[in-house]
């Protein structure tokens, strides 16, 4: 369960970085 939370956090950070790169 802990690794799932880590993946979720990484996904959120990656998504924010991707959106920032697109803008």
Curated annotation (Swiss-Prot):
Keywords assigned: Amphibian defense peptide, Antibiotic, Antimicrobial, Secreted
GO CC term, one of those recorded: extracellular region
InterPro entries registered for this protein in UniProt: Dermaseptin_dom (IPR022731)
Coiled coil: none
Subcellular location: Secreted
Any one of the GO BP annotations: defense response to bacterium
Keyword Heme tagged: no
Expression by tissue: Expressed by the skin glands.
Protein task: Possesses a potent antimicrobial activity against bacteria, fungi and protozoa. Probably acts by disturbing membrane functions with its amphipathic structure.
Family: Belongs to the frog skin active peptide (FSAP) family. Dermaseptin subfamily.
Protein name (record): Dermaseptin III-like peptide
């Amino acid at each position: 369960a802990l690794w799932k939370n880590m993946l979720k956090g990484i996904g959120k950070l990656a998504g924010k970085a991707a959106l920032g790169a697109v803008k």
